[in-house]
Regions:
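Walker A/P-loop
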Residues: 43-67
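Inter-Walker segment of RecA-like/P-loop motor cores
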Residues: 87-88, 92-129
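N-terminal pre-P-loop "Q-motif" helix
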Residues: 23-46
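Post-DEXD/H (motif II) to motif III coupling segment of the RecA-like Helicase ATP-binding lobe
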Residues: 130-191
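Cys/His-rich short segments
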Residues: 1-26
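Residues immediately C-terminal
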Residues: 82-85, 111, 142-143, 173-174
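Conserved catalytic network of the ASCE P-loop NTPase/AAA+ motor domain
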Residues: 68-71, 110-112, 127-130, 157-162
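Conserved RecA-like ASCE P-loop NTPase motor core of nucleic-acid helicases/translocases
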Residues: 74-82
């Protein structure tokens, strides 16, 4: 018996927003440095790795980049292999970006908006074809993403040809460290 999941493919379109966000604290010097690198990677359509310890504020370091991307009309996705991480991150994102239409997609949710700003599990990327200008991948080292070639392919096929990818993790796989140029690895050793 085959286990087949059907996905509705979201039609790709562009739409900008102001992407105002509220952050209840000021980023540290290290966090600001990482945030600026994220914006540059989005602007230049680069792949970078944010290598920071757990609790370093990786989610909040994304905010300036999200704002920049949405103001340009970019479609963005924040992706995690795990539902619990998607739920936790989506709460923080929705609390910060109060006026944004954000699709939260995982096995117990459904798409409500146009897919311009998505927080989802990696499996949900099958809904999108050459749609995202920017993809943030949290916990890139986590199972099943790290071991499943079809999920890695879903990341590629959901992205536009010219796109930015921001990998985020406290424990990067050796293969990822070897694939990303040293100057595109932002390492934050402390909280």
């Amino acid at each position: 018996m085959d286990n087949v999941t059907r996905y509705k493919i979201t039609e790709s379109s562009q739409s900008s927003s102001q992407a105002y966000y509220h952050l209840s604290f000021e980023l540290s010097e290290q966090q600001s440095y990482a945030s600026e690198h994220i914006v540059r990677a989005i602007r230049m359509r680069q792949t970078i790795l944010l290598y920071a310890v757990t609790g370093a504020g990786k989610t909040e370091m994304m905010f300036q980049g999200i704002q920049y991307a949405r103001r340009q009309g970019d479609n963005i996705a924040i992706v995690s292999p795990r539902v619990d991480v998607v739920v936790e991150i989506s709460k923080r994102i929705k609390d910060a970006f109060l006026n944004e239409d954000i699709d939260i997609l995982h096995q117990q949710s459904s798409q409500q908006f146009e897919g311009h700003f998505v927080v989802c599990t990696v499996h949900q990327l099958y809904r999108f074809k050459q749609h995202f200008d920017t993809i943030f991948i949290d916990e890139v080292d986590a199972f099943p993403l790290s071991m499943d070639k079809s999920l890695q392919q879903a990341l590629k096929s959901s992205s536009k040809v010219e796109h930015a990818t921001i990998y985020m993790t406290a424990t990067p796989p050796k293969q990822l460290l070897s694939e990303i140029p040293h100057e595109n690895i932002i390492k934050l050793p402390a909280r």
